[in-house]
Amino acid sequence: MIHSKIKIAFFDTKPYDRRFFDEANQNARFGFDIRYYETRLAPASAKIAEGAQVVCAFVNDDLSAETIRTLHDVGVELVAMRCAGYNNVNLTEAHGKLRVVRVPD
């Protein structure tokens, strides 16, 4: 059976983010297909995540109800926050559509 690589769309990334995640992704346990976007995640930018199973978002990204619906519509299954907070995530809208995880406090 052939397993395809998990595709991750990283939003609001800087060069230092890319270096860190690319280095970590070299580990044989990972090998994800990573796409980086400098733009922040918002309703207008959410469609560029199409084709990714996972979105990695940051503290200033907008995960409002509209963004969550768009991510769900384009096939995203998981939002991984690169921060401890998640007050920018509409968890009510995400329920039943996307899983949301974050770094521990």
Model-identified regions with their sequence ranges:
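Phosphate/diphosphate ligand-binding glycine-rich loop within oxidoreductases
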Residues: 52-105
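N-terminal glycine-/charge-rich "phosphate-binding" loop or analogous flexible N-terminal tail
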Residues: 1-52
